[in-house]
């Protein structure tokens, strides 16, 4: 059931983590890109350790790889729209220079994803006035993205003010679809709400970028019970690559195909590379994709 319009990538976060720079620091750009080629993915997302465009483009061209996009931490509520817009403009200049398509935005005001706080209990919320500021700010950023030929994809994320299905509903209802699209991340949706399909079913027309992240349910239950932080939870192995956890990606992929999705699907799994060998897990994801998604096979759903 292959769709030639869909491009498959794998994120650098399995090799190195921008939030914990010491993890995987030995994995160079050449190492990462070489592993991506071996695992037969078409591209990646830019990490914080990626070099300037002139150097990066040469490395990508030599391997026939693309960069789909890059994460941007917005602080619209904390710093104001003008400040966020200025920083985002610089971000978009970089994306345009490397031939990327997606500007992945997460509002980080009050975020606890980098703190030692209970990720399952202590997520922030926004006031009515803060929500209004966020709507306006994201539309401003979306217009900037368009001016560079890019698409803004908002990333609901654990530990932020836009995490749950209800919060995504609120954001989607109050933003212009032509300016603010949605990044669909299976793992964040499942850990947040216990379900990964409702977002996909409700917002197929808004989804312009996809992360395939699997979840180890037993590890997640233990992390929830122990009140771990986001970083503690992913270092314990809460996330993994497709086919190694409890999510049935055949259901997700079929819905994407039926909905006419034609963007990137990026495998993303925060893990400790000293425990989960990056190339081993990239190959594991590749085998699952080939066997159960592109070949139209079946894998029994476990949730």
From Swiss-Prot:
Needed cofactors: glutathione; Co(2+); Mn(2+)
Involved pathway(s): Polyol metabolism; myo-inositol degradation into acetyl-CoA; acetyl-CoA from myo-inositol: step 2/7
InterPro entries the UniProt entry points to: IolE, IolE/MocC, IolE/XylAMocC-like, Xyl_isomerase-like_sf, Xyl_isomerase-like_TIM-brl
TM stretches of this protein: none
An annotated Gene Ontology molecular function: manganese ion binding
Pfam families: AP_endonuc_2
Keyword annotations: Cobalt, Lyase, Manganese
Any one biological process term the GO annotation gives: inositol catabolic process
Annotated family: Belongs to the IolE/MocC family.
Name of the molecule in the record: Inosose dehydratase
Biological source species: Shouchella clausii (strain KSM-K16)
């Amino acid at each position: 059931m292959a769709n030639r319009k869909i491009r498959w990538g794998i994120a650098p976060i399995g090799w190195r983590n921008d939030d914990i720079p010491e993890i995987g620091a030995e994995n160079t750009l050449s190492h990462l890109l070489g592993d991506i080629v071996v695992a037969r993915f078409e591209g990646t997302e830019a990490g914080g350790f990626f070099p300037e465009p002139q150097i990066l483009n040469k490395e990508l061209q030599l391997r026939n790889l693309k960069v789909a996009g890059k994460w941007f931490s917005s602080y619209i509520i904390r710093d104001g729209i003008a400040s966020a817009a200025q920083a985002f403009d610089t971000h978009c200049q970089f994306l345009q220079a490397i031939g990327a398509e997606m500007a992945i935005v997460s509002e980080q005001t009050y975020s606890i994803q980098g703190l030692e706080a209970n990720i399952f209990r202590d997520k922030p919320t926004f006031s009515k006035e803060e929500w209004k500021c966020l709507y306006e700010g994201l539309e401003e950023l979306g217009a900037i993205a368009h001016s560079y030929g890019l698409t803004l994809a908002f990333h609901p994320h654990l530990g932020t003010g836009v995490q749950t299905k209800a919060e995504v509903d609120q954001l989607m209802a109050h933003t212009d679809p032509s300016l603010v699209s949605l990044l669909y991340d299976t793992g964040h949706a499942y850990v947040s709400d216990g379900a990964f399909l409702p977002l996909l079913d409700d917002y197929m027309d808004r989804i312009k970028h996809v992360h395939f992240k699997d979840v180890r349910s037993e590890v997640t239950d233990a992390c929830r019970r122990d009140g771990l932080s986001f970083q503690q939870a992913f270092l314990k192995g809460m996330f993994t690559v497709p086919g190694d956890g409890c999510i049935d990606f055949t259901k997700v992929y079929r819905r994407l195909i039926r909905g006419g999705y034609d963007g990137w699907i990026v495998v993303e799994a925060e893990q400790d590379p000293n425990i989960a060998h990056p190339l081993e897990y990239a190959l594991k994801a590749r085998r699952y994709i080939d066997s159960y998604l592109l070949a139209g096979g079946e894998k029994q759903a476990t949730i």
